[in-house]
Design a protein with these regions (language model features):
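Ligand-binding pocket segment of bilobal, Venus flytrap-like solute-binding proteins
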Residues: 1-72
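Soluble non-cytosolic domains of exported or imported proteins
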Residues: 5, 24-27, 42, 92-97, ...
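Solvent-exposed, polar/charged alpha-helical surfaces in well-ordered, non-transmembrane soluble domains
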Residues: 12, 27, 31, 35, ...
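Sec-exported extracytoplasmic/periplasmic mature domains
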Residues: 16-19, 34, 38, 53-56, ...
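Solvent-exposed loop/turn segments at secondary-structure junctions
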Residues: 45-49, 74-77, 93-94, 108, ...
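Flexible, solvent-exposed loop/hinge segments that line or gate ligand/substrate-binding clefts
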Residues: 62-93
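Mature extracytoplasmic/periplasmic domains
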Residues: 85-145
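Extracellular/periplasmic bilobal clamshell ligand-binding domains
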Residues: 130-168
Length: 168
């Protein structure tokens, strides 16, 4: 959103504020917060749903209950990054009609409700409710920057990570 110089400054700031070298996965972030290793962390939202709905007495449930999750928004755009998934049918697919039917089902209300309920994903259909755990995080404001624009800068972003030694 703000160019390479500010991206580098931001990345250096994140690195400077790391409690330890970045490692592990989304559940590890919650574990580290609960363990006092760090005060905040970044994780995919659906892990919050998995942890908060884990079986009572498990580490995952303890981690989920021990964190306060928020949906961050960027001041300039008023939105937050969301991961996306895509699907396509190959031009020469031998069973094209069935492939299209599968894709149509995947975006249907029943399938989207299943994704929301079973995996705490954000439905692509506005008329499908989010899981209550996800709703409790507040409204989702999606960063409007098109993925094609983000993709244009992937190589530069990777080079910045190397330049600031983020993984060292």
């Amino acid at each position: 959103h703000r160019g390479e110089a500010q991206a580098e400054q931001w990345l250096r700031g994140v690195k400077t504020n790391l409690a330890r070298k970045a490692a592990g996965g989304d559940r590890d972030v919650a574990r580290d917060i609960l363990g006092g290793i760090c005060d905040i962390g970044l994780a995919n939202a659906y892990y919050v749903g998995h942890m908060k709905n884990a079986a009572a007495g498990t580490d995952a449930r303890k981690w989920g209950d021990g964190i306060k999750a928020i949906r961050p928004t960027f001041a300039q755009t008023g939105g937050t990054h969301v991961n996306i998934s895509g699907a396509a049918v190959a031009k020469h697919a031998p069973h094209k009609d069935n492939a299209v039917k599968l894709l149509e089902y995947l975006v249907s209300e029943p399938a989207q409700a299943l994704y929301a309920r079973a995996n705490y994903e954000y439905p692509v259909r506005a008329n499908v409710a989010q899981d209550p755990v996800m709703q409790a995080l507040g409204p989702l404001q999606v960063d409007p920057l098109p993925i094609a624009e983000i993709a244009k800068h992937r190589k530069q972003a990777s080079q910045l990570v190397d330049k600031v030694g983020f993984d060292q």
